[in-house]
Amino acid sequence: MAKESMKNREAKRTKLVQRFAAKRSALKAIIQDPNAEPEAKWDAQLQLQKLPRDSSPVRQRNRCRLTGRPHGYYRKFGLSRIKLREAAMRGDVPGLVKASW
């Protein structure tokens, strides 16, 4: 299991991303607008840099919902490979069966 502090850190990042999403997208739209003035683009770039680092979605890490494990993560299920296998063996995941040929 992942440390509790790592899970809390990820939760904090998720909240920051949600809080600054609108502001971040507005600033990016100004920066990418070909008709915008260079000064406006420069100001938008500076404001974007002043936002918290953790408010950027690329700093988030997908983690298992049960254990917090960061590797071997299956997006479709939100679980790590280990917990997904355990759930499949118990029959908790509908339609998922062990391969046999």
Curated annotation (Swiss-Prot):
Part of the 30S ribosomal subunit. Contacts proteins S3 and S10. Binds 16S rRNA, required for the assembly of 30S particles and may also be responsible for determining the conformation of the 16S rRNA at the A site. The keyword Ribonucleoprotein applies. NCBIfam families: PRK08881.1. It comes from Alcanivorax borkumensis (strain ATCC 700651 / DSM 11573 / NCIMB 13689 / SK2). Keywords: Ribonucleoprotein, Ribosomal protein, RNA-binding, rRNA-binding. This is Small ribosomal subunit protein uS14. InterPro entries: Ribosomal_uS14 (IPR001209), Ribosomal_uS14_bac/plastid (IPR023036), Ribosomal_uS14_CS (IPR018271).
